[in-house]
């Protein structure tokens, strides 16, 4: 026998008065004895808190503040705790001998709300030796201990091997563990279940009859028949769904044509517009691409024209600039020619003037010579006259002196005086103060030498004077020539400059002689330089045209390469037309082939669509017509096999349905007639009595009763013997067993149980051996199990039958589709894909177009290359002869060098031309420049000074000589000699004076005549000089003008200037002709550019419009495509065969479908509005929305339980397959599902009878319970009168109310509610719906009234109410009821829990002193009989001889409050044993 679980102990940690206290609980009754405030209620509160840790329920009334409102947070728990961590733990051992410690950690929460934090936990696998207090406390010393926190407890337990610690976040999980381990009797799944459990504990704790429990005894004692209720609900739901499905089938059948019509027209309407937009989008894209290609081509042409225009404009600009420069050069050349001609005329004038000047120069020179000679003669005459005058004066002076001397005494004294005078004059003249007559001789030699020197110098000066006098006029002429050539200069420099000019003149004449050769060489070099420049220009132009720079060495190779290229390009250009013609012919052939394929493509696409549908339907790929015909034969064979299998599955399904119907009979009667016979005989079916047999026991009882398991148990067989006569409506074998149906057991047989079998000894000579059936059906659990397996099998069979039926129909339709395909499309379906061929041909056409464009481009490029090569060869033909010129890099330098030499030579020629005559005249007279004509006066002064010096020297020598001569006169003088000498001298002087005067007269006459002649000559010279100066000034002006003209007026200058002008004129003419050509070409290019620009603007406008249209359409198209893909309708709308229809044909098709759709959706407001919106041509997505709306509308009208698809098109196909079959099947299903009102009444009655029997069994346990005047307690269960009437009507008079139960608009629950209202019109149903009322009427508990009755004294049986009973009687009665509830819970929960667990039973009773000793003894007896633990509390010991008693005394020690506990076990013959650990006081210590 399974042992019942027990609570071993209760541990309180840190509660008020209990620091660490463990109460060992007795197996029966534990008594808490003590005065008021001793801690009895606190201990019980700790137990209840650990049992139900739900703060929303805990409410300890005796400690709640008096007058507290419901808003108070404190429900009596906060004040029972101390600050810090608190624990309440229950140590239990279950039926499996597993020790389980469950409990809660409590902690006061700071604040005014007096909240308590609770954390439930459980400990499993704890060794028996470990006490609970050891787990949660830590001993610090002998007098102190500390309470561990929950985390520390967890860590401590984790260190213990085999111990499991669980902390729970929800109370449901906590109670679930306690239920599974057998600590509580009922699984508390919800707050409502916890509330019931707490109300039970509360009623037990506070005693008395709980009104909360007695009012809801049905909820506590009667189990909810959820299986029956769920069966009714499932049945109703199935019926409702069945009816809705049948109605949907009928509606769908009526709307099938509308489906087809609506889908067909909607598809045509939307697909035509969809494909038209797709075609238009493709056309627009093609047009946009064509526009873009043409735009790019035009842009390239415009860019080429622009480049060409830029090149021509640049070239024109160059030519314009060159023309300007050429015009300027031409004008300059013309002006230069004019200047040269002017210069030549000027040169002629200059030459005439120079000739005149030369003539005047000659005459002027001649006249100058004449004047010079006249001046010289005049000077000579003047000198002669002056000399004559001087001589006359000197002679007169001498004559006077001598005359005077003649008058003095010619004495020696005079001589002496004269000697002295001579000596003094000698001293004075010779500046010799120390001169003596003796030294006079010496000084005389000296002064004579000086005189000789002075005389020589004077002679030299005389010679110079003579030369100067003769060259005076020549010097002036030579100086004038030098000044005219060199410009103003110092006269002292004239000789050196003249010599330099003569030397330079020789060089200049040499250079001037080279002018003509140099000019010819320069002309030749300039011509070559111009040719070189022209060649360089041609080379630069050639390189520019070729786009590459070439070296001179590469030109010949390039010329050969270009000639070879011309030869090859000429062949390519000549063959290009043939290639173009071949490409165009191939293009035309491709176009005709594409047109043919486009006509054939729709037919092929229709065949492919049909073939694809067949492939999708059958899951096969067909590659030839032979495979199609072979598959058709396979379909026929498959159809035959499927039909055979469908019939087999249908037969098996019907058999399962019959078995389910048979097992579903009320009471387990497999034959419906047995129920009627049982009611007729007043008995009960044996299957009903054993209806509660568990699934494990079902095989045993099924084998025990064998064939008699369908027997009827009757109270008395003799009373029904007469009824058996003439009984025909019954099974072949009817078993009747005599016995009390309320207390029937299996004692009527003698049974031996074997291994999976029994031997039943029916009689001494008749045994029956029955094996346990593998599939028992005895008892409700076995039947439900079998029915459940049959239902599962039936579901599989139904699904298989439906699948096979659908496959048969599908195969038949597939056969028809194959037949249609073979008749219509087989001939074209397996031909090559025309669209692939079209794509290939289009690709080839694009390649041809590209090849043509490339060919045209290449041809044009080749022509351009050909022209460029020809131009390059032409340019090279002009360049190659001038390669030497191009290679001659020194030509310009040589030209510059020759130019410089020519300039020097021309400068020399101009110099010679200008000064040649002067140099020729200067050369013979250059020597006269050695003496400056302006130094003649100086020379004369020098001569006069030399003469004076010679005279002074002569006088000094004469004085010295006179002194030397008169040395004798110093002594004496011969006076006779002196007198005779003086007379001779005087005579001579007179003669000479006369001669001198005559000479003076002649000199004066000659001077006057020569002066007149000199004046005449001077006048002629002045006139010549004036004419010469005028001519010279004019010549200088002409030379300046010639210099200002700045040209060389040589003999070839005019020819060169004219040739240069003609060359520039030719270049200018060529430039102007080229410019005119360029202007014309530029005008044509501008016109072409303007045309291209207009075309480009138009193309850009068209392209942008088209692109904007494409982009706009793309945005709409993207929305359309997104909508199409999101809704999965692309396959329906993208009908490729429509792509080959024109826009008008598609628009016509869409318009026709639109007209049909307007009529089709006229009655549907939503579709009508969507269709009206979809007619907007600018919003193509609205047509998709309409199509989706149509599909959605059709999907909503498709029942998924009927048709296994969301696609209305497939739904239409499946409709035709499924509708007829489903109609049949659902009709039969409804007939099978429909339950009769009689069956419902029988089920409810049987359930009521079963529960009444169970309550009677519970009452048997309460018969011996007595409390005070209460002798017995029982539960009375009665059927309500209104509900009994309802059951009678359902079972007997259901025909009168078939209008309710046969109505398709009402469910069975609603019909039952309507019937209840019809039978009880006086009852107000309130706001409840018929469905709710009907569901309540299907619950058997609502048919019963349950109340507690007590047999009290002389009053007999009366209703148990607290007012009619004493306090002790009420407590005992309430406790009895609670024990009954606990037992009922255990019976109800037995199926949910393991069979090897018997849960703990424990109740509370506070203030048990209100019971007398007899009542207490009754409680003890009840606990012993029911194996129940009880915790009671009373001020005094109630029954210390039984159970365990704890004496609690609250004491205060040193301001510390604690409870002193003493525990005693019940009295026995031996001395009472003190419980361990209860003799010492519980002295709490402060936690360190």
From Swiss-Prot:
It comes from Salmonella paratyphi A (strain AKU_12601). Residues 666-783 are annotated as: Flexible hinge. This is Chromosome partition protein MukB. The keyword Acyltransferase does not apply. One of its GO terms (molecular function) is DNA binding. It is found in: Cytoplasm, Nucleoid. The lineage of its organism: Bacteria, Pseudomonadati, Pseudomonadota, Gammaproteobacteria, Enterobacterales. The gene is mukB. Plays a central role in chromosome condensation, segregation and cell cycle progression. Functions as a homodimer, which is essential for chromosome partition. Involved in negative DNA supercoiling in vivo, and by this means organize and compact chromosomes. May achieve or facilitate chromosome segregation by condensation DNA from both sides of a centrally located replisome during cell division. GO terms for cellular component: cytoplasm; nucleoid. Residues 1049-1074 are annotated as: Disordered. Belongs to the SMC family. MukB subfamily.
């Amino acid at each position: 026998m399974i042992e019942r679980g027990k609570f071993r102990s209760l541990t309180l940690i840190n509660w008020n008065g209990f620091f660490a206290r463990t109460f060992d609980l007795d197996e029966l009754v534990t008594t808490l004895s003590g005065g008021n405030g001793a801690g009895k209620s606190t201990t019980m509160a700790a137990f209840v808190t650990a049992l139900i840790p739900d703060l929303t329920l805990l409410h300890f009334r005796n400690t709640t503040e008096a007058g507290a409102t419901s808003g108070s947070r404190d429900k009596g728990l906060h004040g029972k705790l101390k600050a810090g961590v608190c624990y309440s733990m229950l140590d239990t051992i279950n039926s499996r001998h597993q020790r389980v410690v469950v409990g809660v950690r409590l902690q006061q929460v700071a604040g005014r709300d007096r909240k308590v934090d609770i954390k439930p936990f459980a400990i499993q696998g704890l060794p028996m030796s470990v006490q609970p207090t050891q787990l949660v406390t830590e001993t610090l010393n002998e007098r102190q201990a500390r309470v561990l926190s929950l985390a520390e407890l967890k860590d401590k337990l984790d260190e213990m091997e085999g111990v499991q610690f669980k902390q729970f976040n929800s109370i449901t999980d906590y109670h679930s563990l306690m239920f599974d381990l057998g600590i509580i009797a009922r699984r508390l799944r919800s707050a409502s279940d916890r509330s019931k459990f707490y109300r039970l504990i509360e009623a037990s704790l506070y005693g008395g009859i709980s009104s909360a429990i007695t009012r809801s005894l049905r909820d506590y004692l009667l189990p909810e028949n959820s299986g029956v209720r769920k069966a009714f609900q499932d049945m109703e739901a199935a019926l409702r769904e069945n009816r809705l499905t049948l109605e949907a089938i009928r509606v769908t059948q009526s709307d099938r044509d509308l489906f087809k019509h609506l889908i067909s027209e909607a598809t045509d309407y939307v697909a035509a517009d969809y494909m038209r937009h797709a075609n238009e989008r493709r056309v627009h894209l093609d047009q946009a691409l064509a526009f873009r290609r043409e735009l790019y081509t035009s842009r390239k042409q415009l860019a080429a024209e622009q480049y060409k225009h830029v090149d021509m404009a640049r070239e024109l600009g160059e030519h314009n600039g060159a023309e300007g420069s050429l015009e300027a050069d031409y004008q300059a050349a013309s002006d230069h020619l004019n200047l040269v001609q002017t210069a030549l005329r000027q040169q002629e004038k200059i030459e005439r003037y120079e000739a005149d000047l030369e003539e005047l120069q000659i005459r002027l020179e001649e006249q100058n010579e004449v004047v010079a000679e006249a001046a010289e003669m005049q000077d000579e005459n003047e000198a002669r006259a002056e000399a004559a005058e001087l001589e006359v004066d000197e002679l007169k002076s001498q004559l006077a002196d001598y005359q005077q001397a003649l008058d003095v005494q010619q004495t020696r004294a005079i001589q002496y005086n004269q000697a002295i005078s001579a000596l003094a004059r000698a001293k004075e003249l010779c500046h010799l103060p120390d001169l003596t007559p003796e030294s006079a001789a010496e000084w005389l030699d000296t002064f004579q030498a000086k005189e000789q020197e002075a005389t020589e110098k004077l002679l030299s000066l005389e010679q110079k004077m003579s030369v100067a006098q003769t060259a005076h006029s020549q010097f002036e002429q030579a100086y004038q020539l030098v000044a005219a050539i060199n410009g103003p200069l110092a006269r002292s420099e004239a000789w050196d400059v003249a010599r330099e000019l003569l030397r330079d003149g020789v060089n200049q004449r040499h250079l001037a002689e080279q002018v003509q050769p140099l000019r010819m060489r320069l002309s030749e070099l300039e011509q070559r330089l111009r040719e070189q420049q022209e060649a360089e220009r041609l080379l630069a132009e050639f390189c520019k045209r070729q786009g590459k720079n070439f070296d001179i060495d590469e030109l010949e190779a390039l010329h050969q390469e270009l000639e070879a290229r011309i030869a090859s390009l000429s062949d390519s250009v000549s063959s290009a037309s043939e290639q173009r013609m071949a490409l165009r012919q191939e293009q035309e052939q491709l176009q005709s082939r594409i047109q043919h394929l486009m006509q054939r493509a729709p037919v092929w696409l229709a065949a492919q669509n049909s073939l694809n549908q067949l492939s999708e339907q059958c899951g096969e790929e067909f590659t030839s017509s032979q495979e199609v015909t072979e598959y058709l034969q396979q379909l026929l064979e498959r159809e035959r096999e499927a039909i055979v299998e469908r019939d087999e599955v249908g037969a098996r399904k019907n058999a399962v349905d019959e078995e389910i119907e048979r097992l579903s009979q009320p009471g387990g009667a497999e034959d419906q007639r047995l129920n009627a016979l049982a009611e007729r005989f007043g008995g009960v079916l044996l299957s009903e009595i054993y209806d509660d047999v568990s699934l494990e026991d079902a095989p045993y009882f099924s084998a025990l009763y064998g064939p008699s398991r369908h027997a009827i148990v009757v109270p008395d067989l003799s009373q029904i013997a007469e009824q058996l006569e003439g009984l025909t409506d019954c099974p072949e074998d009817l078993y009747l067993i005599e016995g009390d149906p309320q207390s029937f057991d299996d004692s009527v047989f003698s049974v031996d149980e074997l291994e999976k079998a029994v031997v039943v000894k029916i009689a001494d000579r008749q045994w029956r051996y029955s094996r346990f059936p593998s599939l028992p059906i005895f008892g409700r659990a076995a039947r439900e199990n079998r029915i459940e397996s049959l239902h599962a099998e039936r579901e599989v069979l139904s699904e298989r039958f439906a699948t096979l039926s659908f496959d048969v129909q599908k195969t038949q339709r597939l056969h028809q589709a194959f037949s249609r395909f073979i008749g219509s499309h087989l001939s074209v379906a397996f031909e090559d894909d025309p669209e692939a061929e079209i794509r290939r041909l289009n690709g080839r056409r694009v390649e041809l177009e590209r090849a043509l464009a490339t060919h045209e481009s290449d041809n044009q490029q080749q022509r351009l290359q050909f022209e460029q090569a020809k131009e390059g060869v032409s340019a090279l033909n002009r360049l190659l002869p001038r390669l030497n010129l191009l290679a001659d890099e020194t030509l310009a330098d040589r030209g510059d060098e020759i130019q410089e030499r020519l300039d020097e030579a021309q400068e020399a020629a101009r110099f010679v031309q200008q000064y040649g005559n002067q140099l020729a005249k200067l050369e013979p007279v250059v020597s006269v420049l050695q003496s400056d004509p302006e130094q003649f006066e100086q020379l004369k002064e020098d001569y006069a000074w030399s003469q004076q010096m010679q005279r002074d020297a002569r006088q000094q020598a004469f004085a010295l000589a006179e002194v030397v001569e008169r040395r004798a006169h110093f002594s004496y003088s011969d006076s006779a000699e002196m007198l005779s000498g003086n007379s001779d001298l005087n005579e001579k002087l007179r003669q000479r004076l006369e001669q001198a005067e005559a000479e003076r007269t002649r000199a004066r006459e000659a001077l006057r005549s020569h002066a007149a002649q000199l004046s005449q000559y001077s006048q002629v010279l002045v006139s010549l000089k004036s004419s010469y100066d005028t001519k010279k000034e004019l010549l200088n002006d002409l030379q300046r003008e010639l210099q200002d003209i700045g040209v060389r007026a040589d003999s070839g200058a005019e020819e060169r200037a004219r040739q240069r002008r003609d060359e520039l004129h030719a270049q200018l003419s060529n430039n102007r002709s080229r410019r005119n050509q360029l202007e014309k070409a530029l005008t044509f290019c501008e016109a072409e550019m303007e045309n291209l620009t207009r075309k480009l603007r138009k193309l850009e406008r068209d392209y942008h419009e088209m692109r904007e249209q494409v982009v706009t359409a793309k945005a709409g198209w993207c929305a359309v495509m997104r909508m199409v893909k999101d809704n999965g309708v692309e396959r329906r709308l993208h009908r490729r065969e429509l792509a080959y229809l024109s826009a008008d044909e598609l628009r016509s098709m869409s318009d026709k479908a639109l007209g049909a759709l307007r009529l089709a959706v006229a009655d549907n407001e939503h579709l009508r509005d969507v269709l009206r919106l979809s007619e907007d041509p600018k919003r193509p997505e609205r047509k998709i929305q309409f199509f989706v709306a149509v599909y959605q509308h059709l999907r909503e009208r498709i029942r998924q339980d009927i048709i296994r698809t969301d696609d209305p098109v497939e739904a239409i196909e499946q409709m035709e397959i499924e509708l007829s079959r489903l109609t049949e099947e659902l009709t039969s299903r409804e007939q099978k599902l429909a339950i009769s009102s009689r069956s419902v009444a029988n089920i409810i009655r049987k359930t009521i009878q079963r529960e009444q029997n169970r309550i009677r069994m519970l009452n048997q346990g309460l018969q011996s319970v007595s409390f005070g005047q209460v002798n017995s307690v029982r539960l009375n269960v009665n059927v309500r009168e209104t509900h009994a009437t309802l059951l009678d009507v359902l079972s007997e008079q259901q025909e009168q109310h078939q209008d309710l139960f046969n109505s398709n608009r009402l469910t069975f629950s609603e019909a039952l509610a309507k019937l209840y209202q019809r039978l009880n019109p006086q009852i107000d149903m309130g706001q409840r719906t018929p469905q709710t009322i009907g569901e309540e009427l299907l619950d058997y508990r609502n048919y019963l009234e349950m109340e507690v009755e007590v047999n009290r004294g002389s009053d007999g049986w009366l209703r148990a109410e607290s007012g009619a009973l004493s306090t002790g009687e009420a407590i005992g009665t309430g406790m009895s009821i609670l024990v009954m509830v606990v037992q009922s819970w255990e019976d109800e929960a037995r199926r949910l829990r393991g069979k090897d667990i018997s849960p703990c039973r424990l109740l509370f009773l506070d203030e048990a002193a209100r019971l007398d000793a007899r009542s207490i003894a009754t409680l003890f007896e009840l606990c012993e009989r029911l194996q129940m633990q009880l915790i009671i509390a009373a001020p005094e010991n109630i029954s210390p001889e039984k159970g365990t008693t704890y004496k609690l005394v609250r004491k205060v020690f040193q301001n510390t409050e604690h409870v002193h506990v003493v525990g005693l076990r019940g009295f026995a013959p031996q001395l009472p044993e003190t419980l361990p650990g209860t003799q010492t006081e519980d002295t709490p210590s402060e936690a360190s």
